[in-house]
């Protein structure tokens, strides 16, 4: 039922964003992610394969949102290792570092969306509280064009 409503609104307006769909349909954003034809769920148990793919990208656009701050980092996706219950990101070739509790990730979504009128492609990592932990976006070049090799890699993930 929800999927049909989403598809109907997308037919009416091909440029409608996922967040606008959530507002119009008065449902949570994660329900839109779970039911939109432009979003695919990625298996959490394959997260290491996903991170390996991301390390092959020229750079990533990492986004972390909190209620009072939006953190954006554009850099190579870092190498990491498991220790003390975390995936520890430490890589001299990347400014991205930190400690990820992989066990807290309950859903991963590959999403094609529209942001600020432009196509946007992201990998969203959600916790059991249905809140976004972080997201990785297909990066853009200095002309604000999507980096094609990264987009092709994203599309190959969508095809899995």
What kind of feature is each model-predicted range?
Residues 1-132, 137-160:
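Eukaryotic intrinsically disordered, low-complexity regulatory linkers and tails enriched in Ser/Thr/Pro
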């Amino acid at each position: 039922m929800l999927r049909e409503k989403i598809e109907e609104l997308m037919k009416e307006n091909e440029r409608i964003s996922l967040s606008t769909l959530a507002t119009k349909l008065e449902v949570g954003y994660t329900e839109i992610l779970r039911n939109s034809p432009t979003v695919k769920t990625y298996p959490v148990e394959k997260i290491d394969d996903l991170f390996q793919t991301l390390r092959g990208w020229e750079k990533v656009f990492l986004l972390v949102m909190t209620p009072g701050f939006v953190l954006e980092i554009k850099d190579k996706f870092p190498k990491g290792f498991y220790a003390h219950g975390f995936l520890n990101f430490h890589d001299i070739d990347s400014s991205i570092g930190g400690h990820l509790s992989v066990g807290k990730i309950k859903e991963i979504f590959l999403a094609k969306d529209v942001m600020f009128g432009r196509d946007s492609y992201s990998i969203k990592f959600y916790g059991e509280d249905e809140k976004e932990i972080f997201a990785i976006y297909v990066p853009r070049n200095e002309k604000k064009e999507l980096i094609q090799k990264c987009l092709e890699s994203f599309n190959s993930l969508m095809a899995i």
